[in-house]
């Protein structure tokens, strides 16, 4: 047995994929990239089972199985096959051997990352490594294999006949805020930045350095309740809303301010001009620090580069090109029915293949210190096994035709369209999964 998706480049892969796709009769009426999906999943049976469930354990089992069924046939087959092709497998596993120094900042500290929250530099290093891997391997062959370079702006619409959705979504937002901000009387309260302060930051970025002489909050050194200068938070918000290029615009405005101060010393009180320049330079440095932490410490699940992390885990666990097909088969079977963390560990322990215990050794500690929402994207958990499944387990590479049976992994759901002209299958499926109040109350 061996990997049957034999291709070293896109041309060879397309030649392999054409007869394969015709045999599977792929379609794209409900998904962005062609899939096996021919209808929006019907989860009525799961809803009935949920209503009859008597405890949380049973409810979790019902929901997990419903998630598998909801995502079983919607995976992007072309992209999954490319990710598992012999050329990508060989190049990716070799890439980590050759780039140990490039990933050292977080790879060498993996045992620490299993236990606690990463440093921002370790997150930035991960992102840089992921981009280098994509370029070196030649992974990006179409719009669905490219990494994002700009924010995704999308409006999700839920059919009005669905009851309790507003209440449910409000509760989900509240729970998210508790995760982000902690529990207590201030939990869920978002720190608001005045529109007036944002306008001030935009004017500064626009080259109007004179706004620093009279900021809307008064003293340029004034801090908010967090102890952070208001000038710094205003600049951070502008960069967040309008793009990181605004940082360079602000830096240029401060250089213009410095030159103006040097040329107009007589118009300023002794020493005040240089003091102002130093103050704004300090605030700019604070802005850079805050921006780095703000960008890096957003939910790490959202920042995970799924194929890159999947290959990192495979490499770290000792998977070789010759044994890759066994991992693919394991993940394919994992997508046939839901497995909790304990069953996952038991299955990995039972396999005679060395990568089984290798993956277990990568799992984050049960007593992880801090908010797991901020766990480094290179750290594996039983839940993140689904990320690997979405890459390597949709098509069992030793027998690709078996993909017709489907394999459910949560990230597959992102392939559903959000187009209302086809009844927004993405929103419809998600709503079916979470509309039952028993799941979220």
Curated annotation (Swiss-Prot):
Stimulated by divalent cations such as Mn2+, Co2+, and Mg2+. Disulfide bonds: none annotated. Its main location: virion. The record marks 213, 277, 352 as: Homooligomerization. The record marks 269-270 as: Cleavage by host CASP3/caspase 3. GO terms for molecular function: RNA binding. The DEVD motif is a CASP3/caspase 3 cleavage site essential for viral replication in host cell. However, the importance for viral replication is apprently not linked to caspase cleavage. This motif is involved in homooligomerization. Binds dsRNA and ssRNA and probably participates in the packaging of viral genome. In the dsRNA binding mode, the nucleocapsid protein specifically binds to the vRNA panhandle secondary structure formed at the termini of viral genome. Does not discriminate between viral and nonviral RNAs through ssRNA binding mode. Displays dsDNA endonuclease activity that is sequence non-specific. Probable homooligomer; forms a double superhelical polymer. Monomer. This is Nucleoprotein. It comes from Dugbe virus.
